[in-house]
Amino acid sequence: ESFCKTTGGKGLHVVAPLKRDVDWSELKAFTKKIAANFATAAPDRFTINPLKRERHDRIFLDYLRNDRGSTAVAPYVVRARPGATISLPIEWNEVNARLDPSRYTLASVPKLLASRKNDPWAGMTKHRQTIAAAQRALGLAA
């Protein structure tokens, strides 16, 4: 089970609630393998290279957020950017070619939240998964 949110910038964060049964280095290695598989399968679309000058028009898969001490913007945070964009939890069906994270702003989000029938992250705290099953399913077992 995973959940998605905008970053308040151009990106998205995928959040997967996990049991504390692996250490940070194991988790980072796992997420790096997933990201590298995407980058290898579609090198014209994805990259794991953090250097902006090397990305061109590719999507940067930032597995580096999965390390002890790394930070990621919290949900519902207003970013210090033009338009006062917000890091907003969204439903997976909202992740499509029409998604425009810049429309989630301090001005627009209160109305959006009032109109939502469900919290996209409802039940998140009930999920605690291991990465072992995902590793096996993806052929990434250590």
Predicted regions located by residue number:
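Short beta-strand
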Residues: 2-8, 49-53
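Short, conserved phosphate-binding/catalytic loop or strand-edge motifs used
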Residues: 6-16
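Generic "edge-of-domain/loop-turn" microfeature
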Residues: 11, 21-23, 68
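Catalytic palm subdomain of template-directed nucleic-acid polymerases
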Residues: 15-27
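C-terminal accessory nucleic-acid interaction domains of nucleic acid-metabolism proteins
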Residues: 25-142
